[in-house]
Regions:
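Structural motif
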Residues: 4-6, 103-104, 166-167
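Phosphate/ribose-recognition catalytic cores of enzymes acting on nucleotide-derived substrates
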Residues: 137-182
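Active-site segments that bind and position negatively charged phosphate/pyrophosphate groups
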Residues: 38-148
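Single conserved hydrophobic/aromatic residue that forms the stacking wall/gate
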Residues: 200-208
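A glycine/threonine-rich phosphate-anchoring loop and its flanking beta-alpha core
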Residues: 1-44
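C-terminal binding/interaction regions
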Residues: 189
Length: 208
């Protein structure tokens, strides 16, 4: 069913604790990363609270445009999952208590972007720009989960298709794409190949 109306009440957000206000901003940062480079720039140059209504409208409008193009999530709509495959794994690792959804997605975005840069698919420096924006809004940029464990958890993600997972990566800020990876490709793509003792590799080491 499609919504007939989207209600936006920024005043309600003022009742949230700072941690959970920032949690929601992680999704706004995501939209800037995958679709709306001007929003990403504005989040860096201004305070989100100073243009809250415009920011929310921009995010809702971006989602509307993407969903209208791909209602069944068979193509372009997958872009909305940027950061979520590893983000869901981080949430599971923390037993849904250690990290909020936005915190986990933020780290997931960094891990995906770092892998994209490592493999020559993402413009160098993109990961650093995302990290700086997450830090500005006091969102974590690391987690204590071994990367190998996160990849194992990601292998059971609900978005898995057969023996592959569609990861969302960035060419640059505002320009995203889908990359299907087989489960066997994950360790090498994320830097956990046989030359690395990845049982001790932790997520934060891949985003420095």
């Amino acid at each position: 069913w499609q919504p007939r109306l989207v209600l936006i009440d920024p005043e309600l957000l003022s009742t949230l604790p700072p941690r959970f206000f920032a949690d929601g901003l992680a999704e706004a940062i995501k939209y800037g990363c995958i679709y709306d480079a001007p929003l990403f720039e504005r989040l860096g140059q201004e305070r989100a609270g100073d243009f809250l209504e415009e920011m929310i409208f921009s995010c809702v409008d971006s989602k509307r445009r993407i969903v209208e193009e791909d209602e069944r999530e068979s193509g372009r709509r997958m872009l909305l999952n940027f950061g979520h495959t590893l983000g869901h794994a981080i949430e599971k690792y923390g037993r849904f208590e250690g990290y909020s959804h936005g915190e986990a997605v933020g780290v997931g975005m960094l891990l995906a972007c770092a892998a994209g840069e490592r493999n020559g698919l993402t413009q160098p420096g993109t990961c650093g720009r995302i990290r700086s924006l997450l830090e500005k809004y006091r969102l974590p940029v690391a987690c204590d989960a071994p990367l190998s464990t996160l990849l194992q958890l990601a292998a059971n993600d609900k978005k898995r298709m057969g023996d592959s997972i569609h990861f969302i990566l960035l060419r640059k800020i505002g320009d995203s794409f889908t990359l299907p990876l087989s489960l066997n490709q994950l360790p090498s793509f994320f830097g956990c190949d046989k030359s690395v003792s990845y049982t001790h590799l932790r997520a934060h080491e891949t985003v420095l």
